[in-house]
Curated annotation (Swiss-Prot):
BP terms from Gene Ontology: regulation of actin filament-based process
Family: Belongs to the costars family.
InterPro entries attached to this UniProt entry: Costars, Costars_dom, Costars_sf
Protein name stated in the entry: Costars family protein ABRACL
Length: 81
């Protein structure tokens, strides 16, 4: 799969699993994304896809790298709707 395609799939999954935050943007906890069976089947390297999407300014999250367990409560926010 190419990066553009994986980022578009990630957007769909954030919309599916997330909810609107106080700013009206869709967000989801990293732990919810990471532990979702459908996401696990779609993304071979979820963290890599998240980093690519952040570089493209499609999403944002605190920090540079998200790790399972440690960052489960970090919000992944979709910047475009």
């Amino acid at each position: 799969m190419n990066v553009e395609h994986e980022v578009s799939l990630l957007i769909d999954e954030i919309r599916r699993l997330g909810s609107k935050n106080a700013d009206g943007k869709t967000s989801v906890k990293f732990g919810v994304l990471f532990n979702d069976d459908q996401c696990a089947n779609l993304f071979e390297a979820l963290v890599g896809t998240l980093k690519a999407a952040k570089r493209k300014k499609v999403i944002t999250f605190d920090g540079e790298l998200l790790l399972q367990g440690v960052h489960d409560n970090v919000d992944v926010v979709l910047l475009q709707d």
